[in-house]
Amino acid sequence: MKKLANYLWVEKVGDLYVFSMTPELQDDIGTVGYVEFVSPDEVKVDDEIVSIEASKTVIDVQTPLSGTIIERNTKAEEEPTILNSEKPEENWLFKLDDVDKEAFLALPEA
């Protein structure tokens, strides 16, 4: 598992790379009230993926890896507070495929 600063986990699960919010980010932003996925399926490093509005701030999450978005947590658009959950199966943001393995390995360890 990789960790970007204090805000994003990246975990390789099978052939996919799952991106989720860290507990630090959840604490920093407060209760999530609005989520909008803004990216196309094909993304490059630093592309904005999702915009999150929470009680303490608004953030735009960018991807540290290039690849193809296979799945977005669209349930979070309907029920944004699930991103405040401690459960990984609820607080994930998106899943990438076609990722350069070396680029993933170069990310900081969690």
From Swiss-Prot:
* Entry comment on modification after translation: Is lipoylated on K-56 by LplA2 (SAV0327) and then mono-ADP-ribosylated, probably on D-27, by SirTM (SAV0326). The mono-ADP-ribosylation state of GcvH-L might regulate the availability of the lipoyl moiety for redox reactions; ADP-ribosylation would inhibit the interaction of the oxidoreductase with GcvH-L when it is not required, thus ADP-ribosylation of GcvH-L might be acting to keep the response 'off' under non-stress conditions.
Instruction: Determine if Ribosomal protein is one of this entry's keywords.
Output: no
Q: Name one GO biological process term.
A: glycine decarboxylation via glycine cleavage system
Provide the alphabetized UniProt keywords.
ADP-ribosylation, Lipoyl
Give a Gene Ontology cellular component term annotated to this protein.
Answer: glycine cleavage complex
Q: Which domain of life is it from?
A: Bacteria
List the transmembrane segments: none
Function text? May act as a carrier protein for the ROS scavenging lipoyl moiety and/or as a substrate for oxidoreductases such as SAV0322 and SAV0323.
Protein name according to UniProt:
Glycine cleavage system H-like protein
Give the lineage.
Bacteria, Bacillati, Bacillota, Bacilli, Bacillales
